[in-house]
Structures are given as C-alpha cells and as structure tokens.
C-alpha cells in the first residue's frame, strides 16, 4: 500500500468519498480516515461486518472489509470515481457528519487495540 497516497487522498477528502486500498499483507480491502467512517456507515446500514481499529502507523481510523462486502458495496454504488487493482474511489450520496466522525475516532483510540500494522 502506498501510505503517502492514502494520506493525501484523505487530506483531500471532504467527507464525500470512500477510498479503499488493497492491503496485500492481509489480502483485504482497507479504508482510512473519513473513508473508513463512510464505509462503516454503509456496512452498518446493510448489516455487514467490518473490522475497525485505529492505525498507529497511519494515525487514522481504519476499517477492513472482505471481498464479499466490497462486491456488495460496488453493486449498490452508482458513482465509482476510480477503480484499479489496488484502489477504488467512490462518491457517497451524502457527506459524513464531522461530529459523529470525531466521536467514533475518540472511541477507537480509547478502547480498540491495533490488530494489524497498516
């Protein structure tokens, strides 16, 4: 994974996008920062499981989904902005709520251990 590209993408994300990255070391798709929260909302509203944590290496929240959840996301999405073997960009119908995002990050930092080095 290109950590610099992830950092830049999330810096430029105004809360309207989900950027997903293939993490080759675990073989699953990951989202960071605002993207992770947007993806969490999608997973919760559709009853999908996801692993959530705070990445110490990236200094951002992280969400990991399986390929099956990714396929469901892509089937329910009409605005895919980019799709390669290692990165998928999706425009969400609505921006995330910043207060809710900050509360989620606080929760992750406070109680969830870092499961994988990301």
Sequence positions of predicted segments:
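Basic, polar low-complexity surface loops/patches
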Residues: 1-118
């Amino acid at each position: 994974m290109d950590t610099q590209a992830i950092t830049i993408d999330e810096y430029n994300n105004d809360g309207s996008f989900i950027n997903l990255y293939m993490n080759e070391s675990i073989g699953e798709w990951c989202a960071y920062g605002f993207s992770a929260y947007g993806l969490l909302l999608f997973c919760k509203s559709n009853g999908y499981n996801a692993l959530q944590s705070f990445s110490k290496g990236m200094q951002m929240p992280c969400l990991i989904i399986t390929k099956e959840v990714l396929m469901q996301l892509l089937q329910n999405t009409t605005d895919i902005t980019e799709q390669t073997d290692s990165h998928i960009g999706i425009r969400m119908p609505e921006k995330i709520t910043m207060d809710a995002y900050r509360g989620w990050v606080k929760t992750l930092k406070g109680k969830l251990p870092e499961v994988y080095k990301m």
